[in-house]
A protein has these predicted regions:
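A general, composition-driven signal for non-globular sequence regions
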Residues: 1-3, 20, 202
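Bacterial N-terminal signal peptides that target proteins for export
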Residues: 2-14
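Bacterial N-terminal signal peptides
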Residues: 12-23
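Phosphate/dinucleotide-binding and metal-coordinating scaffold of catalytic cores
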Residues: 25-569, 579-589
Length: 589
């Protein structure tokens, strides 16, 4: 019996972890708004004027932008809990965006703009229900152009960066060292009187930004999210304008598929020198989640001046770090990030390998100034200490780690370079995605338990239709109950999310199957007619951690007839999900 309860707690813990990663629950350093906090701390900046809504001054990296959003509470509650789930976000055919616009008013540096479009943004790591990253589109509902040089705001919550400095300093370094990147500064964001903390105000990758960076904003634009130039994956690049055509990307893929790459032909499609600079800069800054290490967070733009593609960095909220901060991966950024297909192939060519080494040395000699970077960090830390949200308790320690990276980076890279060219240990990584392997349809009647119950297989009532890997699953016995998740531990001020757990015995082999599902706390209530809520979770075949045990993720929708987190209360509803398994991510270390 003790083993059964332990298995249940592990199950609820792991699917809750999935929920934390995908449904926007807060992390320990997340800046949740305090209902008692009515106003943002003051910066003692001079009174703003409408002239500040010119891109030239608006994105001044030394300026902290003031953004005050007013939106109906019902609309805010609707958009802030919209989310992607891990499995559906990473299926091979990417799902449509779950985010929708609502009408709002915004005051930016004292300039009032009414009837703008407001929506949540983010892929996975930055999703948050309480401090969401936001898009503000001026002309979504009304034909208006209140600003010069930009037509929308991109406000990133820096959820993965407790310093709030990574995007600001990274994009500045990219631009200064020759890679076109968005301009960026910081913003104090308030929604309906509640202070959400310090965000990054990042220039949107739209025609005004492209015009500023390249001199012409009319070229083809694609966004890359967990994708690379593999022949069968090209159309996972997201078209961002009407000029975007997949044919040149298919040609790049065909060239990179060859064992010996035709560099001259590739150079007709990709600006090789520009890419080498982008590649070396990603490596220098420790961009573990960028194109060359994780095939993620980038745009490619076909510059009309030469019809060649240039790379633009994006999602730069986790640079200046020695390791990927999420166990068990802990990938260490190195002198050469070579997991991308383009970097991997180019490093095998002596000519481009030599040019990469030369460019890294040039970056270190001409642009990487420890004195300048440390002065920027020190100044920003002093300015932000009174502005970061009180829940951001790791701010000081994170700034210390940021400084440590700056102080030690040159020595680490020079030591690696002194050892000679890196020997590649394998081919490029296959981008990670999920493949559907089954489905589950459930109707259930359960009870809420404040503590994990005894004999869970005998609890509740379950009607289930389940298929896994082509097998129709039959159960000898299956039970259900609902409780708070027990793991991972959350900060005291973060409520523990609800879970719905099914434990059953499979007829075919007597194996135990555990089905764990979770929803955001705000959605754990009876649903209205024709309404469904997002459901995420896992399926465990066998006992987790034991030989032969298999874990798969599930994603879908559900309804609640009854739902209350109170001992003995009824929890009843339906669940429709698909089962997925990971494919790709053959990382070579």
């Amino acid at each position: 019996m003790t083993q059964t309860i332990h298995r249940v707690r592990l199950a609820t813990g792991f699917f809750t972890l999935a929920l934390l990663l995908t449904a926007g629950c807060q992390s320990e350093t997340s800046e949740a708004p305090d209902s008692n906090q009515a106003a943002a701390p003051q910066t003692n900046q001079p009174a703003p004027s409408p002239a500040e809504l010119s891109a030239e001054t608006f994105f001044d990296p030394d300026h902290i932008v003031e953004v005050d959003i007013r939106v109906p509470e019902q609309s805010w509650d609707t958009i802030r809990i919209q989310a992607r789930d891990f499995a559906s976000a990473l299926i091979k055919q990417r799902a449509a965006s779950p985010f929708t616009y609502v009408k709002a008013d915004v005051t930016i540096n004292g300039v009032v703009i009414k009837d703008v479009g407001l929506r949540k943004k983010g892929f996975l790591g930055s999703l948050d229900d309480h401090r969401p990253s936001l898009k503000i589109k001026f002309a979504e509902y009304v034909d208006q152009s209140p600003a010069s040089g930009f037509d929308r705001l991109t406000l990133n919550n820096n959820k993965q960066d407790p310093t709030r400095l990574s995007q600001l300093l990274s994009y500045r370094f990219f631009n200064q060292s020759g890679t076109v990147a968005p301009r960026c500064n910081l913003a104090r964001v308030t929604v309906n009187g509640k202070y959400l903390g310090i965000y990054s105000n990042v220039e949107s990758i739209k025609p005004p930004m492209l015009e500023n960076g390249f001199g012409d904003g009319s070229g083809a634009l694609f966004e890359g999210t967990v994708v690379d130039f593999y022949v069968d994956s090209v159309e996972k690049f997201e078209k961002k304008n009407k000029q975007a055509d997949y044919e040149p990307l298919h040609e790049i893929a065909r060239l990179l598929a060859e064992a010996d790459v035709d560099l001259a032909a590739l150079g007709q499609l990709v600006d090789i020198e520009s890419f080498i600079n982008f590649w070396a800069t990603e490596s220098l800054l420790g961009f573990w989640d960028g194109y060359n290490n994780n095939q993620n967070n980038f745009f490619i733009y076909q510059d009309p001046a030469d019809d060649k593609f240039d790379f633009i960095p994006w999602g730069a909220d986790a640079l200046f770090q020695e390791n990927m901060p999420l166990p068990p991966f802990l990938v260490r950024p190195r002198f050469v990030n070579w997991q991308s297909l383009l970097a991997n192939q180019l490093y095998r060519i002596p000519e481009t390998q030599q040019r990469y080494h030369e460019r890294m040395n040039e970056l270190l000699e001409k642009y990487w100034s420890e004195e300048t970077l440390l002065a920027q960090v020190n100044s920003l830390q002093e300015r932000l200490t009174e502005l970061v949200h009180e829940d951001n308790k790791d701010f000081t320690q994170a700034c210390d780690r940021f400084r440590s990276f700056i102080k030690t980076r040159r020595g680490r890279l020079e030591k690696e370079m002194a050892d000679g060219p890196v020997t590649l240990k394998g081919r490029a990584k296959i981008p990670f995605y999920f493949r559907q392997t089954g489905h589950i349809s459930l109707a259930y009647e359960a009870r809420w338990f404040d503590t994990t119950p005894q004999q869970p297989e005998q609890l509740g009532s379950v009607t289930i239709d389940m298929e896994l890997a082509g097998e129709k699953i039959q159960f000898k016995q299956i039970g259900v109950f609902s409780e708070h998740s027990k793991w991972p531990p959350l900060p005291p001020n973060v409520p523990k999310p609800p879970s719905i757990v099914f434990i059953g015995t499979r007829v075919s082999d007597g194996e135990t199957l555990t089905l764990g599902f979770g929803v955001p706390i705000e959605m754990f209530k009876p649903t209205e007619k024709d309404q469904t809520v997002q459901i995420g979770g896992i399926v465990i075949e066998g006992e987790f951690g034991k030989p032969g045990a298999e874990v798969k993720m599930v994603s879908g929708r559900g309804t609640f007839s009854k739902a209350e987190m109170k001992e003995g209360s009824a929890v009843t509803g339906t669940i429709e999900v698909f089962i997925t398994e990971p494919v790709g991510d053959r990382r070579q270390e």
